Amino acid sequence: MIAAVIERCAGIDVGRKFIDVCVMVGEAQAEPTQQTRRFSTLNEDLERMHQWLRENHCTHAVMESTGSYWRPVHNILDDGEMEVLLANSQHVKNLRGHKTDRNDARWLAHLLRHGMIRPSFIPDRETRELRDLTRRRKQLVGCAADERNRVQRVLQEVNVQLGTVLSDVFGESGLNMLDALMYPDATPAEIADLAVRQARKKIPLLKKALQGHRMTDHHRRLIRHSMEHLAFLEEEITELDREISEHVKTHTALHVASQLAQSVTGIKQIAAAAVIAETGPDMTQFSNGGKLAAWIGTCPGNNISGGKRKGGQTRKGNPWARRILVECAWSATRKKDSEAQRYYERLKPRLKHKPALIATAHLLTLQLYKALATGNPYTENTQTELTTA
C-alpha cells in the first residue's frame, strides 16, 4: 500500500455546467473518509463549494486542465488558503470502464492524496494576461494568412499569375496591382506599370502574367471582401502589438525577462513577449534547461531498447511556445555566422531540414533558459563546434 502524503485534499472534475468534488480526509496510514458533491458552475455555487472545502480544512485541491473550464474554479479557489494544482489530463486518466464524473473526482483526490500528481504550470495573473494577448495576436496572424491565401486562390482561378512573378503579392507593387484589378477597364499594361522599385524590372513578365485573365465582378467582390477583412486584421494586430508592449513595460518581471530573451539570436520583441507569456519570467520551476525544453517540446523523447538509443520523436509540450521558438530558430539560422546558423548547418546534412530546425530550436531554448535563470544577457559561443549538453 502506498502511504498517503496529504491528509486533507480534494479532487475536482470540471465541466461546462457542473463540477464534481471529492474530499478525502484521513491520517496517512489510515483509510480516508470520502465525500462527493456536485455543484453548478455558477459563481454562487462555486463559492458554496469553496466554503465546503474550508469546512473540511482541505490544504490541497487538484483538477484537470480541461479546456478553459478550470479557470472559473481556479479564480474562486486561488485565494492563498489552499494549494491548487492543475493536472495534465493525459497524466491522470482513470481506468477504462470506470470513467464517470464522480469516479474521476475520486481518482484525482486519490492521486493527490498519495503525491502522484505532476502539477501543470499556472502562471501568475500578469503573465496569464500577457498570454491572452500574445495568443490572440497569433490567432489573428493566422486569420490574416488565411485571407491572403483566399486572394491567391481567386487570382489562380482567373488566370492572374502575379504570384509566379512577384516574390510577395501583398507587397507595395502587388497591392497596387490588386487595387487596379478591381477596375474592369484597367489594361494589363496599365496594371503592370504600377510596379515600383525592383519590381519594375519585371514589367514585361507582369504583362504576360495579367494577359487574358478571366476576372469578373464576382471575383472582384471576393477579393474585395478578403482585402477589407485583411486590412481590419492588420489594424487589430498593430493594436495588439501596442498593448503587448505596454503590458510588458508595466510589469517589471516581464520587462526584465523580455529584455533577457531578446539577447538570444532570433528572438525579437514580440517573440520574446510571446515565449515569456508561455514560460513565465521565473525559471525556478525548471531545474535545468533540459526540463524547460521538455516542457516546451523541443527535445527528443527517450526511445531506448536493448541498451540502444533509437530515434525519439519530440514530446508534445507546449504548442504555443514550441511554434514560437521554431520560428525564431529559422530566423536565427539565417543570421550569418551566428551560433544557431553554425549549429543548424552542422546538423542539416545528417538530420535534414526539419529535425535540424527542431534541434536548433532546442539550442535556443537552452540559451533562453541560461539568460533567464542567471539574469544575464546570453553571450554567444564563438566556437565552431557546438553541443547542447
Name what the model sees in each region.
Residues 1-389:
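A detector of single, family-specific signature residues
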